[in-house]
């Protein structure tokens, strides 16, 4: 590798061609980047004290024999700034040409020195060759032609920006500023330097690369040019097209995170860690096999998450799940989609699984069960699925989920859906649409209707409403206003919302004439009071069980899926000498009661040398000692929030118990504080830092 400080203009001088590899992202600098460059050029050009201005690096590697008449260099880093200064040079050339100026430099000199190779034929005539949609627009500009409308928007708009700036600028200042631009010129040697490692280490200015950019470059950069082109055209470009331009920018990183969750089993990959995780994962696979897998799962993701599914039943199910905003289930659904494509399940079985997932997420939301465990649940769910008993094993998996991860049963769901504030429920349009269109052949456009409170929202109800509700009207209004029994859809104007129930029922377009399923029965109702609201709420709640059903299996079948307890020696408190009395026993009894009360999912297990408390797995282990208890918290030391500094980092130290945080409990007055530390370990295991 050869690196040197160099004037930017010297980089472009001489017969050569800089080529942007096909896998590199297209030109993406925005006007703000161009404005900054322009301001720097003018500032340094006007200054008699500033002799240079550093704009970053240019890293390139030979594509062909460097001794060729016109050597070709593949740009590894610096595409954005080289392209942008080239646009500035074209704008400068055009003004010099238009005004027939020879000072401070002639248009012919700009073209010969920096833009064209005089003796190059065809594309070899251009000093810089961009990729894909950027390629022709830059060539047209160098040729003095107007780019077509189908060309790169950024190339054209940024050229126009520089043309406008140069039109009113002092050309002497501009040219002096351009000549003072400096770069770090890094020329790599083919077969010796690793362009990917160098690319990653560059601390470049400009627009940050996304995780997707880094992954694409990592996969394709080390290949020969012919393979780069084939793999890009056969695999990566189809993925970009499948996503679409905007979704590729906004969604690809998230897709890659879910892809890695599926294939690595690591459910805690954060968006900023996707690239590093991918590099570690990719080393096990040939490039083409890896790209083929990415392309396959791109198809699944786009159908599930981006509405690209063509089959009607699946499209409707995916739409419902998207409207629930249950993105965390996508890893599971992509795996199920793969099984469907491989004919391990039939179409109706696939739909059954999708509706179970939908019901699981919606029932939990209605029952206000914290969402924090969902990411872990869905990321690991497919490990227990038996491909020869697919739907049965999915049902069993949902039915065996414990406490905070449970699938709410019918009793809990019916009870909660009647009392929830469904008007302020953040999936309001979803549940209204699902209620109205369940088992309908012709879908009702729910978005054309407005949500209606049958008993009005007005806290100061009129005399008729007070009479209908009775003496206890204030309590009834407060208790039932936003609940299932009092909410419906209407097409009439909201100005009628305070009218009496009889008027709403009998008016033109009122409840009696409503074609909506949600309004069935309201036309025959004589009075709207607490009894009527409760009855309607009960009826709709029973209907909800049919819309969002819970899985069901005979007990003998479900029992076969339950894990068999391991055989071996069992221990009790009597096997721990330090727990037979004294302070350690007193501390332990107080501690265990409060730990078990943290959540109903917490289990206690006596082992030979310590007592384990676990939800999914151990989150705190208690080692009884003569003077108290030694606790091992299943956290990495940097994760613990310990204002009093009681914890000790035991990373890489041999000990009994799990985790890298140790704390001693030797005084009863410390129990509440230490329970706060223990809760952190439990919350991490339950995924309380994750949201749907």
Q: Can you say where each PLM-predicted feature lies in the sequence?
A:
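Glycine- and hydrophobic-rich flexible loops that cap the catalytic core of alpha/beta enzyme folds
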Residues: 2-267, 507-515, 519-533, 539-558
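A short, surface-exposed helix-loop junction/capping segment
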Residues: 16-20, 565-581
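Betabetaalpha-Me/HNH-type nuclease active-site subdomain
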Residues: 43-71, 105, 382-522, 526
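Secondary-structure capping and boundary motifs in well-ordered enzyme cores
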Residues: 68, 76-81, 175-178, 187-194, ...
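A cross-family structural signal marking well-folded subdomains
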Residues: 212-215, 220-431, 524, 528
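Amphipathic alpha-helical segments
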Residues: 582-601
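Well-ordered alpha/beta subsegment
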Residues: 653-692
